[in-house]
Regions:
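Exported/periplasmic ABC-transporter solute-binding proteins
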Residues: 21-154
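Bacterial N-terminal signal peptides
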Residues: 2-14
């Protein structure tokens, strides 16, 4: 009986589009003290290619990414319309030309993302919405939070 109820609950969860969207959405997170509450998709692209260097108010932006193969990285590459090799070449060229001081900080886990958010007040990162931790502030993308219909980062 309990097994049947558990399986029924899992089936209902898997058929719920809202629950499915929330589990596959990638949130844009910043440090809790960051005054940002919303970012346009275009500005997010500019941010993650290093074209935007500071938040409104002057705080320097620090890009924090997950490694290749992670869902967050897949969404980042989709956002930037780049392959993994193009992304690596892009950042190598940015640093070589002096247009960036360093490549984005790449971390292997959500726990390390959280720690980086604490260490760098201007940090911004992409995090699977179900993995958002205390100390990470989710901001809207084009006025929408993860889980909303039409949310862009899936």
């Amino acid at each position: 009986m309990i097994t049947t109820l558990l399986l029924l609950g899992l089936a209902i969860f898997s058929l719920n589009p809202q629950a499915m969207a929330q589990s596959s959405d990638i949130a844009v997170v910043v440090s809790p003290d960051n005054p940002a509450t919303n970012v346009s998709l275009g500005d997010l692209r500019k941010t993650f290619v290093g074209a935007k260097h500071s938040w409104p108010g002057g705080q320097a932006i620090k890009l924090i990414t997950r490694g290749p193969g992670c869902p967050e990285r897949v969404v980042l590459l989709k956002l930037l319309a780049m392959s993994e090799s193009e992304y690596k070449q892009y950042w190598t060229a940015q640093v070589f030309r002096g247009e960036a001081d360093a490549e984005p900080l790449t971390v292997p886990s959500v726990g390390m993302q959280k720690e980086a958010m604490r260490l760098f007040p201007g940090a911004v990162s992409l995090v699977n919405a179900r993995d958002v931790k205390p100390g990470m502030k989710v901001i809207k993308v084009d006025g929408l939070l993860p889980g909303a219909a039409g949310y862009a980062l899936r």
